[in-house]
């Protein structure tokens, strides 16, 4: 009986979106309280179909200027590749050991602080990133957008928030946070979900 009222007693009554970085692409899980808004088995890669630049790149199966075509690791790497070198982008080149396939949003922002050639790409990426976040923010009436798995530092967060505030105001900017859930909770979160859903809500094992 300890968990009968788990949802009422422990879940915060707010909508949130968990946006996470997964091997070079984006995934999103909208949540209301402590429960996912979308049904189990829904495609969490829907976020990659969001348009962040109507005049942007085309990719088969996606709208013009989609997240996939503009913000994926492969897409951003394509913008950097023409000048990626030990001479022009020394910080990024060293961080990635000369391998652009290892690019992440965090490594781009960190390197752009010293590699001046990267700054236009970094600025454009942040702006388009904020368009994606704002779409999710409005679509799900989210009180928070949690960024998970990106490797962002608090300084990176402030950089993103500054661009977000210029784009859509301070309230939106402050809704963007670094997800407090650490990697050690991956297994525990799964156990919690199974116990809550399978036993407390359904009265037995999940089918």
Where are these regions (language model features)?
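Phosphate-binding/catalytic loop of phosphoryl-transfer enzymes
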Residues: 1-66, 73-74, 195, 200-206
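ATP-binding/phosphotransfer module of carbohydrate and carboxylate kinases, centering on a glycine-rich
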Residues: 7-11, 67-207
């Amino acid at each position: 009986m300890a968990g009968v009222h788990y949802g009422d007693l422990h879940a915060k009554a707010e909508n949130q979106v968990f946006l996470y970085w997964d091997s070079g692409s984006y995934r999103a899980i909208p949540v209301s309280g402590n429960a996912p808004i979308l049904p189990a088995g829904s495609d969490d890669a829907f976020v990659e179909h969001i348009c962040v630049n109507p005049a942007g790149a085309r990719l088969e199966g996606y709208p013009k200027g989609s997240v996939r075509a503009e913000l994926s690791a492969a897409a951003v790497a394509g913008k950097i590749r023409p000048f990626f070198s030990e001479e022009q982008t020394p910080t990024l080149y060293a961080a990635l050991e000369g391998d652009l396939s290892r690019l992440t949003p965090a490594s781009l922002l960190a390197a752009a602080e010293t590699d001046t050639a990267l700054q236009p790409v970094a600025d454009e990426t942040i702006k388009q990133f904020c368009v994606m976040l704002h779409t999710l923010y409005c679509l799900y009436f989210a009180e928070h957008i949690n960024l998970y798995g990106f490797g962002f530092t608090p300084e990176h967060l402030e950089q993103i928030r500054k661009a977000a505030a210029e784009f859509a105001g301070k309230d939106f900017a402050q809704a963007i946070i670094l997800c407090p859930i650490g990697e050690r909770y991956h297994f525990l979160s799964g156990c919690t979900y199974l116990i809550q859903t399978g036993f407390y809500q359904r009265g037995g094992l999940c089918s």
